């Protein structure tokens, strides 16, 4: 994760921060950008907030306090849901506009991962939730060389016509 580049992109977009949230490893975008360990089941909610300026903050459940330990920033630990909400509100501070994996009217379903209840919760703090789609496009890992080799292998195995192969390889 390139924290300075993310923070610069947030400032350029006029966003106060980017709030990542996950439960049960549902947000593959967050997992890839933040390099989360998805081999261990996430049974509790966690949050990671990258402000446009300043130190990131993480909010994790007491049962899984290690969840975001590899990420920079201050760690807050919650147990009851009331504490989770009050710490989350405090973590967002004076933020007015925060990006999340949300897409208005589900226009980009690939990015529309955050559930409506979580969006409502963040809005209840007086924070506008905006789509992280542009940020995701900029910071999510793209195909590695190994993945490209797999795709080329698929093309070679599945297509017989050399013109079709050339066309598909040009797209890849």
Which stretches of residues belong to each language-model region?
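N-terminal accessory/capping or targeting/presequence segment of soluble
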Residues: 1-87
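Flexible, acidic/His-enriched mid-domain "rim/lid" segments that flank
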Residues: 1-4, 82-172
